[in-house]
C-alpha cells in the first residue's frame, strides 16, 4: 500500500478511543473522540495553500487530507476540538517516504512538518520534531473498519508519554477490496 491509498482508506467518520500512559507521573488517562477524515486530491486548493506555506512546489504533493476531531480526555472537562489539513510530499528517490506537512500540529498548535514512511506491512509511521518535543506514531488497519495507532511523545526535558488508540469506522467505508488487502498485509 502507498501513502495515497492509506489516506483514501482512512477517509470517513471514526470513533477513537485512546489510552495514554504518562510515564513520569506513572498514571494513565483515557480519551474519546469523533474523527472525520476527508481525503483531498493533490491539486485541492487547501493542499496547494499548505504547500505554499512551507514553500514547497504544489506539484510535489501527492495527496492530502482534512482531519477534524471533537473529543474529551479523562483528566479535564474541556472539549478538545479542532481540524487540520495534511499534505504528503514524497521523496523523489523513494515515494514510500517523504515529508508530511501539517497546517497545525497535534502536540503544539502551530504548523509543523514531519516525516512519513509506509512500511511493507501497510503501516504508516510518522515522525515529528517540534520545538520542545519529538513524537513517533505508527498507524495500521487491523480490518477495513478498525484502525490502530501507537505513539510515543518525548519532551526534551525527559517527560514522555505512550499512547494506544483504536479507531472504529462509523461511516464512509472505503472500497472493500483495498481495505481487506490492507488489513491482510498488516496481519501477516
Curated annotation (Swiss-Prot):
Induction: Constitutively expressed. Its EC number is 4.-.-.-. Keywords: Lyase. It is an enzyme of class 4 (lyase). The keyword 4Fe-4S does not apply. GO terms for molecular function: lyase activity. One of its GO terms (biological process) is protein-phycocyanobilin linkage. InterPro entries: Calycin (IPR012674), CpcS/CpeS (IPR018536). Optimum temperature is 45 degrees Celsius. Optimum pH is 7.5-8.0. Inhibited by Co(2+), Cu(2+), Ni(2+), Zn(2+), beta-mercaptoethanol, and non-competitively by imidazole. CDD domains: CpcS. Pfam families: CpeS. Changing residue 147 to Q: Reduced lyase activity, reduced binding of PCB. It comes from the Bacteria. Catalyzes the site-selective attachment of phycocyanobilin (PCB) to 'Cys-82' in CpcB and 'Cys-83' in PecB. Also able to add PCB to ApcA1, ApcA2, ApcB, ApcD and ApcF, but not PecA. In vitro can be made to add phycoerythrobilin, a non-physiological substrate, to its target proteins (using genes from Fremyella diplosiphon PCC 7601). Binds PCB extremely rapidly, followed by a much slower phase of PCB transfer to the apo-acceptor protein. Monomer. Belongs to the CpcS/CpeS biliprotein lyase family. This is Phycocyanobilin lyase CpcS 1. It comes from Nostoc sp. (strain PCC 7120 / SAG 25.82 / UTEX 2576). The lineage of its organism: Bacteria, Bacillati, Cyanobacteriota, Cyanophyceae, Nostocales.
Amino acid at each position: 500500500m502507498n501513502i495515497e491509498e492509506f489516506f483514501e482508506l482512512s477517509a470517513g467518520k471514526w470513533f477513537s478511543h485512546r489510552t495514554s500512559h504518562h510515564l513520569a507521573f506513572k498514571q494513565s488517562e483515557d480519551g474519546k473522540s469523533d474523527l472525520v477524515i476527508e481525503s483531498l486530491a493533490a491539486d485541492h486548493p487547501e493542499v496547494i495553500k499548505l504547500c505554499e506555506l512551507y514553500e514547497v512546489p504544489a506539484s510535489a504533493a501527492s495527496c492530502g487530507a482534512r482531519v477534524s476531531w471533537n473529543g474529551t480526555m479523562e483528566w479535564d472537562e474541556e472539549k478538545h476540538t479542532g481540524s487540520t489539513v495534511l499534505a504528503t510530499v514524497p521523496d523523489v528517490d523513494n515515494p514510500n517516504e517523504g515529508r508530511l506537512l501539517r497546517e497545525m500540529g497535534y502536540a503544539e498548535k502551530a504548523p509543523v512538518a514531519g516525516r512519513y514512511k509506509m512500511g511493507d506491512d501497510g503501516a504508516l509511521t510518522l515522525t515529528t520534531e517540534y520545538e520542545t518535543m519529538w513524537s513517533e506514531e505508527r498507524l495500521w488497519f487491523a480490518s477495513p473498519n478498525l484502525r490502530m495507532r501507537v505513539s510515543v511523545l518525548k519532551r526534551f526535558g525527559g517527560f514522555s508519554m505512550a499512547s494506544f488508540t483504536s479507531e472504529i469506522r462509523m461511516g464512509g467505508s472505503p472500497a472493500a477490496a483495498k481495505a481487506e488487502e490492507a488489513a491482510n498485509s498488516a496481519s501477516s
